[in-house]
Amino acid sequence: MSESGFSQRFNPHVVDGRWQKKWEESGCFHAKDNSDRPHSYILEMFPYPSGRIHMGHVRNYTMGDVLARYYRMKGHEVLHPMGWDAFGMPAENAAMERKIHPREWTMSNIATMREQLKRIGFAIDWSRELATCEPSYYGQEQALFLDLYKAGLVYRKESAVNWDPIDNTVLANEQVIDGRGWRSGALVERKKLNQWFLKITEFADDLLDGLKDLDQWPEKVRSMQENWIGRSQGMQFHFNFEVAPEGFDKIEVFTTRPDTLFGASFVAIACDHPIAKALAEKNAALPEFIADCQKMGTAAEDIETAEKKGFDTGLSLVHPLNPELKLPLFVANFVLMDYGTGAVFGCPAHDQRDLDFALKYNLPVKRVVAPSEAESNEAIGDKADTRAGIMVNSSFLDGLSSEEAKKTVIARAEKEGWGKGTTVFRLRDWGVSRQRYWGTPIPIIHCDSCGAVPVPKDQLPVTLPDDINFDKPGNPLERHPTWKNVTCPKCGKPARRETDTLDTFVDSSWYFIRFASQPDDKPFDKATAEKWLPVGQYIGGVEHAILHLLYARFWTRALQSIGRLDIKEPFTGLFTQGMVTHETYKDPEGHWLSPEQIHKDEAGIFLTESGEKVTVGRVEKMSKSKKNVVEPAPILDQYGADAVRWFMLSDSPPERDLAWTEAGIEGCWRFMQRLWRVAAIASEEASAGIDKDLQHRLHCSIKEVGEAIEGLSFNKAIAKIHDLVNAIEKAKASATRKEAALTLFRLVAPMVPHLSEEAWHLLEKEGFVAEASWPEFDPALTVEDEITIAVQVNGKLRDTLTVARDMPKDEAEKLALASEKVIKMLEGRSPKKVIVVPNRLVNIVA
């Protein structure tokens, strides 16, 4: 054994760096594409290079690292890569604020964060590292964009977009949260621009239907995607004008509730509907109303929660089922041009939005659905009745259920030629144009003669110019004096480059494929990539459910449709981890305080500088605004990587939030010292004898820890390790105790790799423990020889007995009847019946 032995305390400041260097030098975590081993692809969502990792990163990547190390020990060839989601607005903001080029700022941040991640000892294949801002990556993304363009899955059109007036760029609906830009927080406006779109709607049915096969995804995420895609069965039909405006004779409407047509009291169109535009030319007040509508974003949620406003056009429409009924036509701020037909009819009695609108503009409210016939004339107040029921006040539909009425109305509309049954989706095509510099240039050239012309692939990548400035808001590419001026590759005439860049969510929609295969001459090699794909286990935040995760599913399908891939789903398993939280603190004036500004003692919590008492607030997600962020670097300096990793896996189930506490990390540090002392037991000379209880605990631990890791129940794995350590510490010297201590370091190697490697080395074991095999358990040794059974009298628990497993029924009965508690309950009576359930209970019926 090494001369250093195990007499000293575990010192991570010496140990951590040594093993990190050895792992890197050996290349032991480099994945081999052509290995004969089973392939496992473990991936955490790659980070934006902000310049520092936070505790959320540490938790996320520790979980993935445990899986990667575990499956490597189980004999798998494991791909566990890391990269950087490196384009985006923060780099441009930094360029403006600090007078530094976005590339320089980004690459500096990447270098810093790479070293921070290496300090935690993650088993990452750094040979596959990528950054989306590198031409070697985004040039291949441009090639894929052109492939999709050729296949008709990319198009350009004028569209109402969500405009962020601070970032001066377009936002997808998913990037608008409560009416504000997801990064800037600015109130979003509606604006018309020529935009590039990806045809995600082409795959709407398949994206929706495919969710049912994702049985290793959280139900919450699948439900969120299902609602976002939003498939609706309904009817498209038209209303004729009573007196038609010039150029129009009818309005096409889509509804999911044709059964409520007899309850209609108005028709509303979007502010950018062709009829609204035509009417605005002749009505001086309408343009002002339309301009007010355009201050809203295009996201459905924001429109739904905004105050409902309408402009009465003075025109009327004829009801298709009751020609005597005339409905007023409004331009309304809650109707979207790109959903359905851009026109709806309102049934106030049974839709809250329509009711709010009707009450505001004094429109009729007519009940047409009631829970029973007796309630057919029950008045509607200020709350719409959305309950199911039967049709009332609806002519030939009366008495039918809503579902029957829908079918009846659609059948009549189709027979008479004024409507038809149809399916629509809430999902819109993905607008990917962004008016910013720091993104992937869209590889299109605009020519007055030829129109939009793809950049020839042999001219890719279209790289970003370095000589730009951010003195003015907006897109520097648009202002660049030379970059956008080119020759048309088709006709040779002067032309201009597309100055929009791609939404950064395009970058993250295929990076996991590039990790699997990185040839220089194409985006990826299909055969090589599919040795790894789909990703076996993907780990990241639930906030990406309808952003990145939906886009990645679309991108994979799009690539399959053009023959680039044979798979449709990118991620077999998805795990959404909880956040890392921390107490919040305020000074007497109510200002937020950071943990570094306070000190704690027995008397309470006080400001270090002034001694004033601090108010302790709720435990909340770590955030800069509330100053409750705990930086990983000083914690790593104090406790080492393994204690931090252990904390991240302990206590809370990984899908729940984890509260960071000093007491918790101190406890993890102490447990590292306990593990180190167990290593000394493993170094003992072998003793004779078998400890059956410890042997049973050991084999149960091997089984239970493995099952817990595979089930991503890391806190349960930690608990089982604690049980085993307790058992080893209590046991007397024996061959079993030495075996258990040796085995322990393979069991904890995925969680605390540095300590495990050091112990493995000092125990003179060959190679890395990271490359050792996961221990096997003997099923026979996981079965307890003795069990506890319940003893009941008349079905109520009266005693418990410890008996041999599989004890014969008659022996169990004798033991139960001999129980003093049972004898006391029977009071000398003979039992009427005794029921014995082997290995579980004895029930005495008195």
From Swiss-Prot:
Q: Which InterPro entries does this UniProt record tie to the protein?
A: aa-tRNA-synth_I_CS (IPR001412), aa-tRNA-synth_Ia (IPR002300), Leu-tRNA-ligase (IPR002302), Leu_tRNA-synth_edit (IPR025709), M/V/L/I-tRNA-synth_anticd-bd (IPR013155), Methionyl/Leucyl_tRNA_Synth (IPR015413), Rossmann-like_a/b/a_fold (IPR014729), tRNAsynth_Ia_anticodon-bd (IPR009080)
| Catalysed reactions, as listed in the record | tRNA(Leu) + L-leucine + ATP = L-leucyl-tRNA(Leu) + AMP + diphosphate
* Pfam families in UniProt: Anticodon_1, tRNA-synt_1, tRNA-synt_1_2, tRNA-synt_1g
- Location of motif 'KMSKS' region in this chain is 621-625
User: Known EC number(s)?
Assistant: 6.1.1.4
Where in or outside the cell? Cytoplasm
Q: What is its main location?
A: cytoplasm
Q: Which family does it belong to?
A: Belongs to the class-I aminoacyl-tRNA synthetase family.
Q: What's the name of the protein?
A: Leucine--tRNA ligase
Q: What is the lineage of its organism?
A: Bacteria, Pseudomonadati, Pseudomonadota, Alphaproteobacteria, Sphingomonadales
